[in-house]
């Protein structure tokens, strides 16, 4: 896309370089703009089937965890419809180039920033995925990836399938919330803080932050099937989406090259067991991950796509049943 072809929409930013790099070279992720919770109280977003559309891309870990939750819980497109942008973000923003005529069939837009500018003409942040749009009002109502899965797991329970797992059980909620903060700061966002760092000091600080936490998780998962014993929870979804991208994208693109996930016995077997669950596997697109990160999110002026790694290894058997017994969700 030439400079003449780049489209802008209101004041919406087109990259992380605008407003997300601090004076000391650290990457400081933007705050979410649309954070009204779903619920049944005044001022909350009504829990109503057919009213909302979720926009995602299989590149994005924040967006992918919404799809995993939908599939585990049985929230179908008759309840919340799903639109998908291409995995390579353009200079004009996330593009609906996978759809017929390059236009989302429900929202009628070509680029995601269009509806950000329409919803809030003064918005100066990036247009991000996941984004939840109220199709009745044709405006964004939530892009709070940090809390969205918990809404699907709780207040959207009337639309869960029979026998759906309780991913956010009441007796573990405070512990899940605490662990989720650690996973976010040291793993999910930790890889970005290393990858987008503008100084050697910030890169090294976050490099060590990520691998120190991976070492602790490796030890924990030697004795526990999931992060909370035998109970699959919201925290496992959050950890998985980073682990699934690590060897393909972060090891090379974000210079996190101390070890691959497949070099950790327990993290690797844990990751492959999760991948063996249809909800996780169906939401994981390794080609989209590779193209999105290595041809879009990282500097690659010649647009050369690496051939590796061999992601067929994700299909190989894991040892979790041998250690912990048959898998039950």
Language-model features: where?
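C-terminal alpha-helical interaction module
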Residues: 1-329
